[in-house]
């Protein structure tokens, strides 16, 4: 959740670190800080609040001259968000500065041991324990590398660490366990970061650190050591993302830009995967025999990716004619899941670093299941540890609220269902062909929706004044309702809940009163009559209803509801792919009307790398 940037080279470090932290703002944070080694020694500057406060404090970095440094944006887990608790944290003697993403679970015990040894603490953070323990180990052995090893051997929990020592001012040390960290390679300069977006303007050649590894970074090169501290050579990944894709490009917000990028993102996700009317997934290493022998299928994800999994369940069950389970990753890892050899676990994650999803992946592999990752970030932890990986090719997604990652994950799941169904012989030719044709025209239909947003903007104006909103839907529309509700609550701060329409009578309808906004998602035409009945039901209690439906459904609903937002006709299983766009726009324009911080909603982070 926190952002880490490190630099060693010939340039002034502080301005470069500030730029990198700016590109990590989307991850969420409540304070920021820098530590730089220069002629004046090791100096640290920190500030609570937005990054602008740190930029002003350091005069854009000019107050911290030096060519080696680390920077950090903190999301508070231990101690309130203030200057003292911000990172970098330092040892009492001022010799070490540490930035940290993760949670040190045994920090309280370590802190008490250090206090008994005479250490004094200033902050409430677990990270200061790392810095103080490191200084104590250094005092015992006199060697920075060995001190880091001794310190790491005593830590329990998760960490991505960047370490700067005044006694070795030409280098950084990095270490990782269950939290993302990568190394960037330049010419006469090298980098450290928690996210590749921080480095795109400086290098495209990166190495992703694995758990237990330690790296020593100098201007001349990077030495990487495995868990047993043996030197290792690791594969370099070249990042092809467009630098401009991580810029707003004239849009008011990243979220709006990314909404409008969805047609092209879906085109990229499909390119090369449909040939002559057939789905071809050459990315997969699974043989036809292995596909036919798949036992249970379980989709594991968090947040919006979980909602994608719910849609994927319908697609896979329809195509494969076998049950599919969808689990929240945070529950799966603790549920003693009934999976084993021959079963397939599909892990979905935009970042490929979500901690709960990583833990679920490892639990699945420990039990003998095969793991297929669906991720956006090339070379991420989930991509590396999965048996197979399908990339979504959505490109950088900066806004906290996901948009194009959601739609590309969904189209990849559709392609997977078609491919497996074809191999297994469980999908009929008519359905297969119709789905393929539908996927091929999806980008154009998405562009059609994005060209006509007047009704959505009008609905957002009246929705913006509300404090409670309900979404209802059945079947695929229920899964879509969950995503629409999540989008609205996370960026507009309106209390929003989604319910399966058939459950209204089981308690929820008691919350409907005069003027209550209800968004009825009714794109699934086989159940349109049921949707109309539910609309009548809530209107009888005074609800104000906005219906999201197809062009055909609009004819049945437009005289019954307060407003209708239509989407083009397509195959039923593809409708969530189109229906989500008006819901994304509705959330965006509602939040805009309310003056919310759309790209960086309060209390939220883009990549959740702690429990």
List where the protein language model places each region.
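Glycine-rich phosphate-binding loops that contact phosphosugars or nucleotide phosphates
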Residues: 292-434, 438-441, 521-526, 530-565, ...
